[in-house]
Amino acid sequence: MTLYFGKRSEANLETAALPLQHLMRQALAINLIDFSITEGFRPRFKQDEYFAAGKSKVRWPNSKHNIQPYSEAVDAVPYVRGKLSYNYYHCCFLAGVILALSKKISVPVRWGGNWDMDLEPITDQDFNDLVHFELYK
């Protein structure tokens, strides 16, 4: 079975920088796990809402989701058994696929489960955003 993004994921992905679009499309084409792109560019009202709710640690315009004309971040959420899954294991599996591919095709990204980019993901973080992937320079 060949996986493909739905219309909403495609629309969200098209708001992101081309290297991220390329990475996410190739990650889906590997056919190891289905996933959706729930966000690319994030407008001010939504960034403010996420900050107030503790879902983001940064205010507008300091998130890589807030960069225009093309966002430097996407939220990629596993799609399992016909629905979005924020399950820890599903998110970590997807992150492994995306991070390995990012190294292979030289599109450096930082994952929201390893903000400090060390060799200890998740356990040494005080804020995990397991569906967040951003271009890293």
What are these regions (language model features)?
Residues 1-36:
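Active-site acidic/histidine clusters and adjacent loop/turn architecture
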Residues 9, 57, 115-116:
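Polar low-complexity intrinsically disordered regions enriched in Ser/Thr and small residues
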Residues 22-23, 27-28, 32, 45, ...:
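Structured catalytic/translocation cores of nucleotide/phosphate-coupled proteins
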Residues 26-55, 104, 112-114:
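Extended, low-complexity, intrinsically disordered C-terminal regulatory tails
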Residues 54-64:
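Cytochrome P450 catalytic domain signature, combining two hallmark sequence patches
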Residues 63-137:
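Catalytic cores and adjacent binding grooves of peptidoglycan-active enzymes
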